Design a protein with these regions (language model features):
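Active-site loop/oxyanion-hole signature of alpha/beta-hydrolase fold enzymes
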Residues: 50-89, 237
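Conserved alpha/beta-hydrolase "nucleophile elbow" surrounding the catalytic nucleophile
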Residues: 89, 93-95
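Flexible "cap/lid" loop of the alpha/beta hydrolase fold
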Residues: 99-107, 112-144
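Active-site nucleophile elbow and catalytic-triad environment of alpha/beta-hydrolase enzymes
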Residues: 164-181
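Short beta-strand/loop motif that positions the catalytic acidic residue
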Residues: 185, 191-193
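Acidic catalytic loop of the alpha/beta-hydrolase fold
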Residues: 196-200, 225
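Catalytic active-site module of serine/aspartate enzymes centered on a nucleophile-bearing elbow/loop
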Residues: 216, 222-250
Length: 250
């Protein structure tokens, strides 16, 4: 699909008459990141849109990511909604995708029916630095990890990884903080974070939940940053329950 002059790999599943849910992958992810959730969302009757963000997976390559403000990603997401003539949707975003979801829900509150964030970032905190550096070492020295990313991103894999790494390590972003926009979010929101998250403290998740007016916090015991992939057996049922309850009550 041609969106804002670049080609995006966009998949639309289910009936167009079903309630819309958009899945936003994490900073090194792709549509494949949601393979454990997609079938069950479809079985529940949702219309699901999942896509490789610009620069990722089977979408066009990208010279640099618009991090951490994600302005180009937000513009793409709005254009996808408009292309499918979707007036309202639920958003489910993981990590960077969760940040994008928060920013869009704050900017366009009437268009978002329900919001689920998993390990989203709303400011930079000291714990993020060591976690990012650990992943850089893993990418450089762990062939299995690198090959897994290559299967998702192909020849773009270096651009994806170092674009993400560079985006979160720019010194000019040290004071980045989106907490002031969170009160603008109007929809029911589930804030999810693994209790053993390698990139964020429990306070980070609490700050998201405290900032969004209609939010509830779920800390998942014994799970790290990759909640949908590490613990689908507990995450997916809770996701379906939350979306079903909040969209139905809209």
């Amino acid at each position: 699909m041609l969106i804002n002059d670049h080609d995006l790999n966009v998949e639309r599943h289910g009936s167009a008459s079903g309630p819309a849910v958009i899945l936003l992958h994490h900073g090194l992810g792709s549509v494949a990141s949601w393979r454990a959730q997609l079938p069950e969302l479809l079985d529940t009757g949702f219309q699901v849109i999942v896509y490789d963000r610009w620069g990722y997976g089977r979408s066009d390559g990208r010279a640099a990511l618009s991090m951490p403000h994600f302005s180009e990603d937000i513009a793409d997401l709005l254009a996808i909604l408009d292309s499918f003539e979707i007036e309202q949707t639920a958003l489910v975003g993981h990590s960077d995708g969760g940040t994008i979801a928060l920013l869009l829900a704050a900017a366009e509150p009437k268009r978002i029916t329900s919001l689920v964030t998993i390990a989203a970032h709303i400011y930079l905190e000291p714990k993020m630095g060591p976690g990012i550096e650990t992943l850089r070492g893993k990418y450089q020295h762990d062939a299995r990890f690198r090959d897994g990313l290559r299967r998702m991103h192909g020849d773009k894999v270096d651009a994806v990884f170092y674009g993400w790494y560079d985006g979160w390590t720019q010194p000019e972003y040290v004071n980045w903080d989106i907490r002031p926009c969170l009160p603008q979010i109007e929809c029911p929101t589930l804030v999810v974070q693994g209790a053993a998250d390698e990139h964020a403290t429990a306070q980070h998740a609490a700050d998201i939940a405290q900032g969004v007016p209609a939010a509830e916090l779920w800390m998942v015991p014994g799970v790290g940053h990759m909640v949908p992939q590490e613990a689908p057996e507990v995450f997916t049922p809770r996701l379906l329950e939350f979306l079903g309850n909040t969209i139905a009550s809209d």
